[in-house]
Amino acid sequence: ILDTQGLRVPTGQVGLIHVHQPAYADFSYVGNDDARRSMERSGLKTMGDLGYLDEEGFLFIVDRASDMVISGGVNIYPAEIESVLQLMPGVADCAVFGIPDGEFGEALAAAVQPQPGAAIDAAQVIAFLKPQLASYKLPRRIEFVCDMPREDTGKIFKRKLREPFWSGVARRI
């Protein structure tokens, strides 16, 4: 587990997961050599997952580095909020992501797909999350969607959820 400078992080601290995999297939991103180089460091490779090792050496995956939100200088991992929100009655699916914020750089937004026939509103979502999360982890904006945009693999396509909020914004965090 390495920090952004490529140094090992202490036990329990979140960093970028790197692995040594000699049988890893050699590939390149067409027209983007920097993307390939960013995945490798001193013979180690990363797929962009964040995690930490506990005192017994067990690995805990926290989130994807590309999904992390930095709000007011604090790193927030959307997967933590999503795991709580998915427990809310009436929620079929959800995604949490960063949107521009003039004061903090980024703020949290949640896209919520209600279960068929469920009637939930933003106030109920916040009321459900509030006792379980720190206040800075509460989404400032709740959007309700009929269907989540999905990649071919079935994963939620968060970039499509973020894009409308970031269009016209010069700086993307």
Regions found by a protein language model. Give the residues of each.
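AMP-binding/adenylate-forming catalytic core of the ANL superfamily
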Residues: 5-10, 16-21, 27-28, 50-137, ...
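Short secondary-structure edge/capping micro-motifs at helix/strand boundaries
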Residues: 35-36
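Short proline/glycine- and acidic-rich turn/helix-capping motifs at secondary-structure junctions
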Residues: 143-153
